[in-house]
UniProtKB/Swiss-Prot annotation:
GO terms for molecular function: DNA binding; zinc ion binding. It comes from Homo sapiens. It is found in: Nucleus. GO terms for cellular component: Cajal body; nucleoplasm; nucleus. Its main location: nucleus. Pfam families: KRAB, zf-C2H2. Belongs to the krueppel C2H2-type zinc-finger protein family. Gene3D superfamilies: Classic Zinc Finger. This is Zinc finger protein 473. Residues 71-81 have a biased composition (Polar residues).
Length: 871
């Protein structure tokens, strides 16, 4: 039976833009992938040769494609170039000769043609340009005229012949018999030569072609031919017209253009040949010229990029948006590739079931199964595909760090790590945030910083709802749930949950000082301390004066090189001087918030305050759907849903931990084992004693100028000063009432909203504050932890105990300004003041008689009740 050949154009399916629009996304993707598989099978049988065309009988000369001659451009090519889909491929930098080759044969308009323009095929095609130029033409001393009439073979040759000029050396590589295969894909039939055995062997990782020089194996005959040239280092293919040598026949197939009218240009510097457009771009590398210079940067666009495309990098024009996640792209090709993540159309490995979004990633992964891993580490037994990776891995065992920094002498294993480290010394921060303008040394740091603006926290804790922007923060948080402390100190056996804390702790035992001063030889534990010390020598060289004397002449103040301009006090570090200067500038608040107008004395406090306005609140709580942050959500959920399995037998109070129950039982036992050595005050818990002892030991350097009260923290002083100044920066949006503290405003707003988040589990009563709920629970439990030391009477609230103790002491702190009468309670004073003001707030509804206090009204109403009872 005679073999019948069918061209691709006969079996191809033509689709218009209207046909593609009718196909859905899922059907279109299925059609695309199936067509791609068929197309790749065809190209395995007969790789494309875009540079030369010939008839099978060899009667006609080779014709240059449209890429080299304008006369050869067909109408199909022109029509294809103008299509919208082709514009995307030209923007991607695809070879014009490839597209025109496909269009000329009617290949682009078929379903197989479109399928070929895909990531995997084009990446392999463009990544190895010489793969397009491989030819089976053997040049055994033939003239250039004879070169043009060579026959392009339509099948795979059973013998691969390589000629080396005068001394020819032939490698015979046997290939398996080609058998015709019939396919019925896409409602069409076609015959093609396919080597199923060879294809299966490549998939299984077999490499049947072996080099006789070094024994290296290859999966294809042409790869063996290319490898064999590396042994001879000769150029076996010689062009007879100019006697110029080439490494491959493919290079020779391109070179005749210089003799047949095609204009190729040779670089005088390197001797490399180029086409006209490529030669112009190459010359600019020598002259330093940067055409098409962007107004936004000093970098010219690459030669394969149009100026319009280069401007998109500065204008940030991203007109293609993803409907799933809202991410924007500059090209529709990037959007299509991104959408595969949402559709979950994944490619699975048949051996290890690993999945990938792109086919090319699957092919790269399959090479790990097929490749012969001959490089093995003798230390740990790890296997590598390449010897270079093994050498790099062995440096870890040997501790080698060949790349050294010239500034500090620090060494690194990789050159890329050294370059990133050198940016610390040069101050280069190429990665800049578009939101706030902050710059970073590394791109990964910029990505982590952007999550502050977007609120994106991909790393979630499985135990609670808390999420984190960095995996290291998640690991540190998970140690709270597991209570695991895997890092142990070898000296004292103390354990830590974080490796950083262990490193800091070990410095206490070793007392190593790795940082040494080059001037005086003094060593330090921290690098920051060394920098602070080096500034002393820098000031000495500049002749810095303190109180009219040079530092060298005053050894006591040698390291106090930072001087206050107001009181002339000196300090050893700049941070100490900054803290000291706040004493002189106290009350001055130059940093003002743009949102609410609040002013601060320090820039760091302003930044911390601005987070209140820019805070992302992604969670809702309560029936009204109030927006809260993740931290607030955790506190609310832990309060309402936390289990309390440990119950007190005395009062019935429950606890989440047994340690809390043990501490609580000390209240009923009356034990106060922790006693202060200075004031004999006792406490039930050790942490309370530690906090109390700080009141004796710690100084209070911050003094209020109005009343002389001292404070330990500036924030406490600022809150206290609002009492004297009457400042109330927090204003209620409902009624306009102002408050001095933000916590007071939050509690007040619950009156308007009616929110009562704290609910009693016993009776269901709700409260606006957690402290009110705690006091209310004592009604059910009968707990009265506050006991009077004089009479032994117990109270549920501390305020009640304070009022009761005034009976024993006779203290009456509330006095009337009119008559001077004193009272124990402020409520009694308010009632007394109504005597002077004649104010009557409580009125009887029956006789309209008014009273100053509610108790008098209640006694009066009993009169009406008795009269009604008598009637």
């Amino acid at each position: 039976m005679a073999e019948e050949f069918v061209t691709l154009k006969d079996v191809g399916m033509d689709f218009t833009l209207g046909d593609w629009e009718q196909l859905g996304l899922e059907q279109g993707d299925t059609f695309w992938d199936t067509a791609l598989d068929n197309c790749q099978d065809l190209f395995l049988l007969d790789p494309p040769r875009p540079n030369l065309t010939s008839h099978p009988d060899g009667s006609e000369d080779l014709e240059p494609l449209a890429g080299g001659s304008p006369e050869a451009t067909s109408p199909d090519v022109t029509e294809t170039k103008n299509s919208p889909l082709m514009e995307d491929f030209f923007e991607e930098g695809f070879s014009q000769e490839i597209i025109e080759m496909l269009s000329k044969d009617g290949f682009w308009n078929s379903n197989f043609g479109e399928a070929c323009i895909e990531d995997t095929w084009l990446d392999s095609l463009l990544g190895d340009p010489e793969s397009l130029l491989r030819s089976d033409i053997a040049t055994n001393g033939e003239s250039p005229t004879e070169c043009k009439s060579h026959e392009l073979k339509r099948g795979l040759s059973p013998v691969s012949t390589v000629s080396t000029g005068e001394d020819s050396m032939v490698h015979n590589v046997s290939e398996k018999t080609l058998t015709p295969a019939k396919s019925k894909e896409y409602r069409g039939e076609f015959f093609s030569y396919s080597d199923h055995s060879q294809q299966d062997s490549v998939q299984e990782g077999e490499k049947p072609y072996q080099c006789s020089e070094c024994g290296k194996s290859f999966s294809g005959s042409y790869r063996l031919t290319q490898h064999w040239i590396t042994h001879t280092r000769e150029k076996p293919t010689v062009h007879q017209e100019c006697e110029q040598g080439f490494d491959r026949n493919a290079s020779l197939s391109v070179y005749p253009k210089t003799h047949t009218g095609y204009k190729f240009y040779v670089c005088n510097e390197y001797g490399t040949t180029f086409s006209q457009s490529t030669y112009l771009w190459h010359q600019k590398t020598h002259t330093g010229e940067k055409p098409c210079k962007s107004q936004d940067s000093d970098h010219p666009p690459s030669h394969d990029t149009q100026p319009g495309e280069h401007q998109k990098t500065h204008t940030d024009s991203k007109s293609y948006n993803c409907n799933e996640c809202g991410k924007a792209f500059t090209r529709i090709f990037h959007l299509t590739r991104h959408q595969k993540i949402h559709t979950r159309k994944r490619y699975e490995c048949s051996k290890c079931q690993a999945t990938f979004n792109l086919r090319k990633h699957l092919i790269q992964h399959q090479k790990t199964h097929a490749a012969k891993t001959t490089s093995e580490c003798q230390e740990c037994g790890k296997i590598f595909r390449h010897s270079s990776l093994l050498i790099e891995h062995q440096a870890l065992h040997a501790g080698e760090e060949p790349y050294k920094c010239n500034e500090r002498g620090k060494s690194f294993r990789h050159n890329s790590t050294l370059k990133i480290h050198q940016r610390v010394h040069s101050g280069e921060k190429p990665y800049k945030c578009s939101e706030c303008g902050k710059a970073f040394h590394r791109h990964t740091h910029l990505n982590e910083h952007r999550r502050i603006h977007t609120g994106y926290r991909p790393h979630k804790c499985q135990e609670c709802v808390r999420s984190f922007s960095r995996p290291s923060h998640l690991m540190r948080h998970q140690a709270i749930h597991t209570a695991e402390k895997p890092y142990s100190c070898a000296e004292c056996k103390e354990t830590f949950s974080d490796n950083n804390r262990l490193v800091q702790h070990q410095k206490m035992h070793t007392v190593k000082t790795p940082y040494e001063c080059q001037e005086c030889g003094e060593r330090f534990i921290c690098g920051s301390t060394l920098k602070c010390h080096e500034s002393v020598h820098a000031r000495e060289k500049q002749g810095f004066f303190v109180s009219g004397k040079i530092l060298d002449q005053n050894p006591e103040q040698k390291e106090k090189c930072f001087k206050c301009n107001k009181c002339e006090k000196t300090f050893s570090c700049s941070k100490y001087l900054t803290q000291h200067e706040r004493i002189h500038t106290r009350g001055v608040k130059p940093f003002e918030c743009d949102q609410c107008g609040k002013a601060f004395g320090q820039s760091t406090r302003l930044i911390h305050h601005q987070r209140i306005h820019s805070r992302v609140r992604l969670y809702k709580w309560g029936e009204q759907g109030k927006a809260i942050s993740s931290a607030s959500l955790i506190k609310l959920q832990s309060f309402h849903t936390k289990e309390h399995p440990f119950k007190c037998n005395e009062c019935g109070k429950t606890f989440s931990h047994s340690a809390h129950l043990s501490k609580h039982q000390l209240i009923h036992a009356g034990e106060n084992p922790f006693k202060c050595s200075k004031c004999d005050r006792v406490f039930t818990q050790r942490n309370y004693l530690v906090q109390h002892e700080r009141t004796h030991a710690r100084k209070k350097p911050l003094v209020c100028n109005e009343c002389g009260k001292t404070f330990r923290q500036s924030s406490c002083l600022s809150k206290h000063q609002r009492i004297h100044s009457g400042e109330k920066p927090y204003v209620c949006d409902y009624c306009g009432k102002a408050f001095g503290l933000s916590a007071e405003l939050v509690r007040h707003q619950r009156i308007h909203t009616g929110e009562k988040p704290y609910v009693c589990q016993e009776c269901g009563k709700a409260f606006t504050q957690s402290s009110c709920l705690s006091i209310h629970r004592r009604v059910h439990t009968g707990e009265k932890p506050y006991r009077c030391g004089e009479c032994g009477k117990a109270f549920a609230q501390k305020a009640n105990l304070t009022q009761h103790q005034r009976i024993h002491t006779g203290e009456k702190p509330y006095s009337c300004n009119v008559c001077g009468k004193a009272f124990v309670l402020s409520a009694h004073l308010n009632q007394h003041l109504r005597v002077h003001t004649q104010e009557t707030l409580y009125q009887c509804q029956r006789c309209q008689k008014a009273f100053r206090c509610h108790s008098s009204l209640s006694r009066h109403q009993r009169v009406h009740n008795k009269q009604q009872y008598c009637l």
